[in-house]
């Protein structure tokens, strides 16, 4: 039976399901960034307020990386999961499809993203709630596994976010994440971000990009007292029908929209030309390129 989160935390009944191989502020999704060209400065925000557009832009990437991530985790069936920063439910859908969970609770600060998540088939099992990654509205030891999928760099205090993940899992429970390698310039949007920076413009980026480094993830997990900490790289590729398909899809990004909207039309045309040259098409006009994610897993000590 599913549970609604409560402000006053209560205990949760039910024996944890384990497997040795698997277990061996409220607006944190909005990043306030100052961008500027020359003497012109403007504050921009990353606002995740359109679940459908986000699905078109990031859905394929997220699913591709999430499939590999779950292959690596190899979780047993029937676990109680919490998906923190579930967004529009892309990874939650994978959990329901592949892991036959006993329960899934999705938490995200964006009601617009959650509205999209509730339209997915996964909503027949998963329950979605508005909430804060740094103050999860669940009792201690409520879940067998806690996951953040492509989220950690948006949490203002990553260590606090990880400590909350640890708190809500049972002793021996799994704490896992994967995050695009933004620090290393290997996120799906980096072909555009790199050219924006080359033009002398500071793009809108998440507040804690440093948390995407593999070393940072390992340090966060070890610092949280987790055991059996392991890491791995995940590399995925995506193909677009042509450059126009690539541009129309990626400009839906909540990180790119405010930056490009603040640019002069001539600068936008220059940016498009630079990105087009950076991503040569094949003989049929298709654009294919890759992105890299860093993943980490650990378990709460028994």
Name each region found by the language model.
Residues 28-52:
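N-terminal, positively charged/glycine-rich alpha-helical extensions of SAM-dependent methyltransferases
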Residues 43-47, 88-90, 209-302:
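Conserved Class I S-adenosyl-L-methionine
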Residues 60-79, 94, 98:
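Conserved alpha-helix/loop element of class I SAM-dependent methyltransferases that forms part
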Residues 80-136, 160:
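Class I SAM-dependent methyltransferase SAM/SAH-binding core
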Residues 144-158, 181:
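A short SAM/SAH-binding and catalytic strip from SAM-dependent methyltransferases
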């Amino acid at each position: 039976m599913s549970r609604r989160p409560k402000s006053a935390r209560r205990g949760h009944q039910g024996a944890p399901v384990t497997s040795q191989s698997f277990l061996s502020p409220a607006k944190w999704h909005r990043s306030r960034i100052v961008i500027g060209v020359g003497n012109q400065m403007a504050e921009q925000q990353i606002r995740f307020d359109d679940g459908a557009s986000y699905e078109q832009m990031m859905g394929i990437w997220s699913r591709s990386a999430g499939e590999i991530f779950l292959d690596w985790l190899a979780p047993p069936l029937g676990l109680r999961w919490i998906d923190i920063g579930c967004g529009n439910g892309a990874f939650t859908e994978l959990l329901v499809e592949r892991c036959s969970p006993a329960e899934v609770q999705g938490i995200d600060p964006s009601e617009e993203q959650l509205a999209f998540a509730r339209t997915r088939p996964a909503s027949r099992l998963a329950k979605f709630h508005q909430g804060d990654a740094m103050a999860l509205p669940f009792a201690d030891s409520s879940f067998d596994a806690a996951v953040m999928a492509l989220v950690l760099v948006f949490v203002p205090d990553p260590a606090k976010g990880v400590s909350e993940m640890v708190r809500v899992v049972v002793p021996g429970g799994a704490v896992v994440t994967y995050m695009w390698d933004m620090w290393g310039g290997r996120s799906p949007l980096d072909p555009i971000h790199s050219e924006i920076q080359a033009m002398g413009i500071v793009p809108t980026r998440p507040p804690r990009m440093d948390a995407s480094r593999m070393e940072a993830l390992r340090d966060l997990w070890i610092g949280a007292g987790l055991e059996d900490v392991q890491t791995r790289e995940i590399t995925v590729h995506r193909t677009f029908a042509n450059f126009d398909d690539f541009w129309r899809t990626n400009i839906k990004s909540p990180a790119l929209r405010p930056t490009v909207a603040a640019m002069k039309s001539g600068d936008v045309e220059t940016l498009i030309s630079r990105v087009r040259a950076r991503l040569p098409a094949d003989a049929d006009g298709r654009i294919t390129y890759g992105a890299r994610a860093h993943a980490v897993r650990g378990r709460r000590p028994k």
